[in-house]
């Protein structure tokens, strides 16, 4: 058996109807388009959602869905456990960027509580949640 000798099974391939080839073909004269009207003409399609000039459904209904705000691209929340990776005890935005915990676009950082933390750190110019603040102060850290 070779690829060039393989042929489809009998009656598995039907030849397509040739339109506009006489009355006897069943698709002659108007070629299955009916008589007159926009859809019988060449290029006579209407765009998706078009309702004949009536206000379409997608414009009658209100908009919905959630669009991510631009602010979210510049904000980040960091768990306290992330600071265990940093050797510095003084932490601010520059130190976080240097240690690749946040990317260069981030401008606002909030520190949130997590259990795996036991280090004295000094935080400057970062937002801190209530529980994270308690935890930092418990281990002798400060927040400016």
UniProtKB/Swiss-Prot annotation:
The keyword Aminoacyl-tRNA synthetase does not apply. Residues 11-21, 30-47 have a biased composition (Basic residues). GO terms for molecular function: rRNA binding; structural constituent of ribosome. Keywords: Ribonucleoprotein, Ribosomal protein, RNA-binding, rRNA-binding. One of its GO terms (biological process) is translation. It holds the Pfam family Ribosomal_L27A. The keyword tRNA processing does not apply. One of its GO terms (cellular component) is cytosolic large ribosomal subunit. Binds to the 23S rRNA. Belongs to the universal ribosomal protein uL15 family. This is Large ribosomal subunit protein uL15. It comes from Wigglesworthia glossinidia brevipalpis. The gene is rplO.
